[in-house]
Amino acid sequence: MSLASIPSSSPVASPYFRCRTYIFSFSSSPLCLYFPRGDSTSLRPRVRALRTESDGAKIGNSESYGSELLRRPRIASEESSEEEEEEEEENSEGDEFVDWEDKILEVTVPLVGFVRMILHSGKYANRDRLSPEHERTIIEMLLPYHPECEKKIGCGIDYIMVGHHPDFESSRCMFIVRKDGEVVDFSYWKCIKGLIKKKYPLYADSFILRHFRKRRQNR
């Protein structure tokens, strides 16, 4: 790179440097970058000027540029846009959080309250048969989840009644009176646990360990 000579007879000109095919001119006026066109060896190269500032601000002064202009341009490819869409979908799925413990409680708590009402409210005395509505609820919503449901039902259900447990006189439970007259007790707690395991298999064990204290084993 060589410094071009400046004739003494000409007016004071702004110094400039010439480096191969590019000419850089420095003056009080806005900076211009000259890009020769055509053959770089031509004696009279044609140039184009690219104006970079209109107010004479210094090069590299970030205050003279907007923050957006200083950012490196980003070209969004089709793959990156697809990845962003997948991330947004994952985030939206994460927002839809489900508290499974509350979900299980919403189902089981009303059933437990219903059975306790039958056993302990005084509505039914020992050996009383359940009302058709209460009996239907027990048969449809609890009994099918007992681990030995078919064995308990046997030849078929005649009706369901309330009475004292044969092994624990202070405890009341429900009994199935079969069509052949045989009476069989069943644990509603086993029905509740079976319901949880059937409907919520992924969360059943942890839920049962947390909410069910160890109980005396009923038949």
Curated annotation (Swiss-Prot):
Record-level Gene Ontology MF annotations: mRNA binding
Cross-referenced Pfam families: DUF3223
Domain of life, source organism: Eukaryota
Stretches for region Disordered: 70-96
A Gene Ontology term for the protein's cellular component: chloroplast
Localization, UniProt: Plastid, Chloroplast
Transit peptide: 1-48
Keyword annotations: Chloroplast, Plastid, Transit peptide
Record-given protein name: Protein DCL homolog, chloroplastic
